[in-house]
Amino acid sequence: MAEATATSPAAEGAAHKNVWTTLITNCDYLPGLLTLDYSLKKVGSRYPLVALYTDSFPPEGHAALQARNIPAKHIPYLLPAAHKDYSNDTRFYDCWSKLAPFSLVEYDRVVQLDSDMLVFRNMDELMELELDSSALKGEGSRVFAASHATPSNCALTTQHADPASAQTQGAPATAGLGVLNGGLQVVNPSTAIYEKILAVLQTPSATSNYAFADQSLLSDLFPGLWVPLPYVYNALKTLRWEGVHSEIWRDEEVKNVHYILSPKPWDEKGGEEGQGDETHRWWWKVNNERLEEEKKRGII
């Protein structure tokens, strides 16, 4: 069970039964987290963002959260019992810990966000999305909600002929490869579901086949039993590119951009900020606004 800490006003997070959460294990993604938090507040969300940190998160990171009154909660660093090699993409080692929100039973609803996201439109409606009650223990047909992953035979391709509906409806959970993207997950925490997840992590014959860590596990454990969200809630920046899924992308409809791949916007230096991708310019505009406001408040 995760424990509240004094690194920031945990009472703010504890006072809410519905929260946004984001995983942070080091300071590499800290600029993203700070700007994500700012963007949620900017669009008027009624719910706090709680930073879920592991033992590796350093003191300077905690200080940054404290200075901005961002609640924080310690979680264990999850890994499968048998080592899974992700040396070609080491970020997947951290991704197992994105399963921790299922354990946070002190909350009624958790919406897990990746720290490399930026919210442009209020999406508090996700806190009211119909999901199975935790009393069903993962045996229902709406265990959690997420968007689809985007391999070459992605489910989003099935929506190209009707881009208008793609703004409000997700492709069926079984469409394409039936694999979710773990960047945004809507969860009703449940001890029973979390125990199912932990049991799979102890099963090498299963985890050895999970190329995408947490999202592979959830897709395998709950095949077709999750609610597919429209892309606007987890709009991978690459979807906007010509030849990917530009047929359905609508700038004015997107609620949350996910800055997958490298470099991240905050990694751009020396006058290159936002030069490589239009969506990166969007991030820098909001980030610079955050920095200006923090400067006025004496936060450096």
Task: Map each language-model feature to its residues.
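Glycosyltransferase catalytic domains, chiefly GT-A lineage
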Residues: 1-300
